[in-house]
Amino acid sequence: MAYNKTNISFGLAVLLIAVVTNCTGCKKRTTINVPRAILQARSATLDELLHIVNRLDGIRTLKASNIKAEYTSEKKEGSLIELEKYPRAPGYIMLKRPDSLRLVIQNPVIKKSELTLVSVGDEFRVWVHGRHKFYIGKNSSEELISDDLEEDTEIPIRAGHIFEAVFPESIPLNDPDIRFTKIEEEDAYAKYYVITVYRNGPSARILPLREFRIERSGLTISRQRIFNDDGQVVSDIHYSDPEQIDKYTLPGKINIERPLDGYTLELEIKDWVVNSVFKDDTFSLEPVEGIKVIRFK
């Protein structure tokens, strides 16, 4: 009888593998736990996703009397990176459209105000209570310069950074110069829709403005990225612990990364209150007698 040498060699190879692995035709099964967020991913149209981004337009004011803030600054010197982390501190926050904010940070032990930040329009005012100093400047300033040469003018944080994180700018649906795209993404934890907003630029260019990542099991915004005209990320904002307040979904945690400004601000927020009425002087802040006032150009 004639035998095919190839078949004999293949059969011997299979037998050898079975002996070495001490397995005679058995199969190894592995169980993988798929995260619930992936299993429960929902579908949404582009119009529905745009509504999710824009639905916060119905909120005129927001406040939270129970927040915790943690600030980390980053300084680069050559190949070295120096991180300075400030302890988590309690406080409260109040916001009013279109551009008013009041943020108070308190001493963690005695709950006395340590820092008060008020911003209306382009002007911000900061009162550092313990240092008896009062700063006045512009949110639009890339660099804060003071005539007082003794002052450290490195104040990278701006009220606008916080405002745009809490109140994401809505997407203009009828602006002919605005374009937006929808794609799908997935990681080990969840599935996402990603909406990227562009603006028509010079010649054939389109310029990225903002990007929203929407987690599909809850259809909530989990991340927002904001770009400058060169396509660099100026704000990378992560949202988590969403909570339903009235008819709105609001985050319990907001992490603001400002890579070009060299700082990160993490906010843990409880007890959101929607559309309350504020006093007329809520967003006013004047220096008290005897305090040193530093004005930035």
Regions found by a protein language model. Name each.
Residues 26-28, 171, 176-290, 294-296:
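Gly/Pro-enriched, hydrophobic low-complexity segments
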